[in-house]
């Protein structure tokens, strides 16, 4: 956030978006492609594990598919709505841009910390329980944000929102194959 704020101040929001997009395109996309590179999958007959995988047509007929889709869609909607309105919301609380950034900068580290804690200690936690934590953690963080009238509780919002937002990627990436196969 501080870097984005500095880019916006220096180049305006359009210029900042162009710069960020260029960094993603030139720097992040090639790294991502390199990291995902692996041995080509050999064309083999369907194995015993693959027979249990649901086809797209089968998945679309399952209630669990639509419930997961709805949960992840609403989560994404709430997250996007937060990012669209977070700075005006801080301003409405009477807080400066610097104070807002001091809080928001903790979301990223909390995302990473949540993933590390899960990788280290959460392997015994079912993906369903993880998903439940995520789907309760995000609205709880938003309630904390809405009800906070002081600066310090907003750090709790940032940490809880960050952890939930970091863990949603694990829940989303794990629940779909668990329910429908790969």
What role is predicted for each listed range?
Residues 129-144:
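Structural signature of the two symmetry-related core transmembrane helices
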Residues 31, 141-145, 161:
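MFS-fold secondary transporters
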Residues 35-54:
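Flexible cytoplasmic inter-helical loops of multi-pass small-molecule transporters
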Residues 1-40:
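Helix-loop-helix hairpin linking two adjacent transmembrane segments in secondary transporters
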Residues 1-4, 57-120:
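Extracytoplasmic gate region of multi-pass secondary transporters
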Residues 152-160:
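Paired small-residue
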Residues 1, 167-180:
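Intracellular juxtamembrane helix-capping segments at the cytosolic ends
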Residues 126, 147-149:
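Helix-breaking motifs and short loop linkers at transmembrane-helix boundaries and internal kinks
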């Amino acid at each position: 956030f501080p870097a984005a704020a500095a880019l916006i101040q220096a180049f305006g929001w359009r210029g900042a978006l162009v710069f960020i997009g260029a960094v993603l395109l030139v720097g992040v996309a090639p790294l991502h492609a390199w990291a995902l590179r692996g041995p080509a999958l050999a064309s083999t007959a369907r194995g015993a594990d693959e027979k249990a995988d649901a086809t797209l047509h089968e998945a679309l007929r399952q209630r669990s598919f639509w419930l997961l889709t709805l949960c992840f869609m609403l989560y994404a909607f709430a997250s996007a709505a937060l990012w669209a309105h977070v700075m005006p919301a801080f301003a409405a609380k009477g807080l400066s841009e610097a104070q807002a950034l001091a809080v928001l900068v903790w979301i990223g580290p909390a995302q990473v910390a949540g993933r590390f804690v899960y990788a280290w200690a959460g392997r015994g936690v079912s993906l369903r329980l993880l998903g439940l934590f995520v789907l309760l953690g995000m609205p709880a963080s938003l309630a904390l944000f809405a009800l906070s009238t002081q600066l310090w509780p907003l750090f709790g919002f940032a940490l809880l929102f960050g952890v939930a937002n970091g863990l949603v990627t694990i829940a989303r990436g794990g629940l779909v194959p668990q329910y429908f196969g790969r």
